[in-house]
């Protein structure tokens, strides 16, 4: 039975990537996940921490600007975060 049978392949691969970063998972499970990712043609960088970055380089500029605009209008966001969003928006224009 395939890992992808009747499942969204991106979700399956995402689960295997998460397995590699989970400290509560056995080495055997991590090896299996690494093999699945390699067989699927997914490049895995072991130096990657799995954390997201704040680099907006590959993102849709319209979506990035929209997110910053939403931050400015959200009453639950701190003044510091709003100031940061304003600076980022000014840099996009």
From Swiss-Prot:
Sequence repeats: 7-37, 59-89
Keywords: Conidiation, Differentiation, Repeat, Sporulation
UniProt KW Repeat keyword: yes
Superkingdom field: Eukaryota
InterPro entries per record: Conidiation-specific_6 (IPR018824), UPF0654_domain (IPR052670)
Segments of this protein annotated with the region 2 X 30 AA approximate repeats: 7-89
CC annotations in GO: cytoplasm
Comp. bias (Basic and acidic residues): 27-37, 77-93
Residue segments, region Disordered: 1-93
Gene Ontology BP annotations: conidium formation; sporulation resulting in formation of a cellular spore
Family: Belongs to the UPF0654 (con-6) family.
Role played: May protect dormant spores from desiccation and play a significant role in the formation or survival of microconidia and ascospores.
Protein known as: Conidiation-specific protein 6
Organism of derivation: Neurospora crassa (strain ATCC 24698 / 74-OR23-1A / CBS 708.71 / DSM 1257 / FGSC 987)
Name of the encoding gene: con-6
